């Protein structure tokens, strides 16, 4: 670009010289200083063209970034709308849940009160019935205790009578056995005695007969006398035996009468035993009835205990429902506090959005003014390509570019401060992460660091490498330049500030307008 413009300028100068040569054939000899200035201006023009192309690229990048920022901002607005709608929907759901829980709690309280009244009435009725049954059973127990005592006495008497009866039976059996043995022995003895007496009589008779036969001849009288005596003795013995038999018969009759008496007593005892067995059956039935009533009473007591346990469980359930009610109330209060906090955050976000919109509008205005300013500079540069180049234009041009960069850098410098203030406020006044929902904001400040990285122009800085520290000029590079260029670069490195000459007052129409850096 620069060589073509220089060639066109040289052609125009030659045409002008030719036209002037027709009038005055004067040969203009260019001094060496003008050549050096021309080279210097050519170098400056190349630098400015490169810088202009670089600024054009940066402007395109900024336009693309501004478009991306606008898309991110629209996405942020949509996300914010969705978040607000979601929060409202969740809030409505929580409010509905709270109302449902309140209704359920009221219904449970009413049901609990009704159940409590019903159970209290049932418990009072059960207590009354239990007291009545208790009194009735105590009286029945007293009566049955008396009956049991009588039955116990009767049982003892019965045992005594049965023992006596068994003893009497044993005695009767023993006496019968003894009587039978005695009668058998007597009969046996009588039979044996009869046999023995008969044998003895026969033997005696035989002996007597023998002796009689013997003594008949000798002692007839003595033998007869002796036989009479023996006969008398035998008759006496026979009388004694008959008397003993009579006594035995009398004793036998007495034993038979005693046996009859014992049989009668046995029949009486059997009758009394049957009567006692009947009474025993009746008492057993009464005891069974009493045991059944006692079991029923125990079952009633168990039911009363179960009712007491059920009542205690209902009381515990009512206490648990009260605790749940308190927890639901506290949860409702927390949700209301979270809702208020979210409303405050929503207002703050809306305010930040308004501030961002204002700052964005100010940035757009600054960019529009900067683009118009650059277009004016380019237009002025194109207009002056056809005319004579003023020596004082180049420093003024540098000063205007530096003023443009200062304006852009000040705009970028004020923007991060405003972007950092709401972030600090949100960190200082924001609720904890647990109570506030996480809202992921888009990267709105992605454009700001890139704008803040743009350093203001300094003379001698081509902008290819960002310089953060002062780099002194290389003497070997300065040898290739002319004296004026070396002095200019040295002054640019020593003092970056430049003053516009007084002849530039005619270009005041290209001065930068005032740009509001902060939103009103």
From Swiss-Prot:
Any coiled-coil regions, as ranges: 33-189, 236-372
Region (Disordered): 1-22, 416-453
GO MF terms held by the record: microtubule binding
Biased composition range(s): Basic and acidic residues: 10-22
Chief localization: cytoplasm
UniProt keyword terms in alphabetical order: Cell projection, Cilium, Coiled coil, Cytoplasm, Cytoskeleton, Differentiation, Spermatogenesis
Subunit-level organization: Interacts with TUBB and TUBA4A. Interacts with CEP350.
Record protein name field: Cilia- and flagella-associated protein 157
Native source organism of the sequence: Homo sapiens
